[in-house]
């Protein structure tokens, strides 16, 4: 179904069965598969491929040579009907690739809302990217990676499969991330190691002084106390009882499967 207010350039192909919302603009030389849904107000500049079982929300800007919903690069994939879901108001720049999920990973690759995916970003099968994230040019996420809200991943950085990038994290450019990065932390290097807290980012997002102080104390326990993670967990949990923002650390530890960067 194609809304009567949508614009589709004559050189583009929209297969029967695709759902194209109100005010969608599909520029020249695009291909839209039969199981694709594109929400109102979304713009495809030109030469964009959207295939597979893919749902794209409202008011996204998708630039040329981007590919969304194509077959993933997992050698075990055998054509199962897995999906891609993208939220609203994302800017997806040139030559971004977002692959469909696998049955082993839950069948879904998901990108939230209000993200900026810069040129040549790759989001592999079964990744989950939250809201208001920035992935800079040539950032690469391996399969099953989670990127939590407000995270920033620098250019030419690669994240190993199954890793978690916590909320408000900043990963510097040209880094290699092979373990989980706790919330609020700045990470850099190959292999990535912690370089303090993303204090400026937290200030821009309205974190109060007492909250920042509590987050600093949690960071010091984690990285400067000389104790093991198991030893500091109860202390961080006690701190979280007084300062809700610190709860992000304890929630993160419960999710972590690859160990945290050190």
UniProtKB/Swiss-Prot annotation:
Organism for this UniProt entry = Pectobacterium carotovorum subsp. carotovorum (strain PC1)
Keyword tags = Acyltransferase, Cytoplasm, Lipid A biosynthesis, Lipid biosynthesis, Lipid metabolism, Repeat, Transferase
HAMAP family, per the entry: LpxA
Q: What class of enzyme is it?
A: transferase
Q: What is this protein called?
A: Acyl-[acyl-carrier-protein]--UDP-N-acetylglucosamine O-acyltransferase
Q: Which InterPro entries match?
A: Acetyltransf_C, Acetyltransf_C_sf, Hexapep, Hexapep_transf_CS, Lipid_A_LpxA, Trimer_LpxA-like_sf
Cross-referenced NCBIfam families, in alphabetical order? lipid_A_lpxA, PRK05289.1
Q: Which family does it belong to?
A: Belongs to the transferase hexapeptide repeat family. LpxA subfamily.
Reaction equation(s) it catalyzes: a (3R)-hydroxyacyl-[ACP] + UDP-N-acetyl-alpha-D-glucosamine = a UDP-3-O-[(3R)-3-hydroxyacyl]-N-acetyl-alpha-D-glucosamine + holo-[ACP]
Report which gene this protein is encoded by. lpxA
What is this protein's function per UniProt? Involved in the biosynthesis of lipid A, a phosphorylated glycolipid that anchors the lipopolysaccharide to the outer membrane of the cell.
* Organism lineage string: Bacteria, Pseudomonadati, Pseudomonadota, Gammaproteobacteria, Enterobacterales
Q: How does it assemble?
A: Homotrimer.
């Amino acid at each position: 179904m194609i809304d009567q207010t949508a614009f589709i350039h004559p050189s583009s192909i929209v297969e029967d069965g695709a759902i194209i919302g109100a005010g969608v603009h599909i520029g020249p030389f695009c291909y839209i598969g039969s199981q694709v849904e594109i929400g109102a107000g979304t713009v495809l500049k030109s030469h964009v491929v959207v295939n597979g079982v893919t749902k794209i929300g409202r008011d996204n800007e998708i630039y040329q040579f981007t590919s969304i919903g194509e077959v993933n690069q997992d050698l075990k994939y055998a054509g199962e009907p897995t999906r891609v879901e993208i939220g609203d108001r994302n800017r997806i720049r040139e030559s971004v690739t977002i692959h469909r999920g696998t049955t082993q990973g839950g069948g879904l690759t998901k990108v939230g809302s209000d993200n900026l995916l810069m040129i040549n970003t790759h989001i592999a099968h079964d990744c989950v990217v939250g809201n208001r994230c920035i992935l800079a040019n040539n950032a690469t996420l391996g399969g099953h990676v989670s990127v939590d809200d407000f995270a920033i991943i620098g250019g030419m950085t690669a994240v190993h499969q199954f890793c978690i990038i916590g909320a408000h994290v900043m990963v510097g450019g040209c880094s290699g991330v092979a373990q989980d990065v706790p919330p609020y932390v700045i990470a850099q290097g190959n292999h990535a190691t912690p370089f303090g807290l993303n204090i400026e980012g937290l200030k821009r997002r309205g974190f109060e002084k007492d909250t920042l102080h509590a987050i600093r104390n949690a960071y010091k326990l984690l990285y400067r106390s000389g104790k093991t993670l198991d030893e500091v967990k109860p202390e961080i949990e006690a701190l979280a009882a007084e300062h809700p923002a610190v709860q992000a650390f304890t929630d993160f530890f419960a999710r972590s499967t690859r160990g945290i960067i050190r």
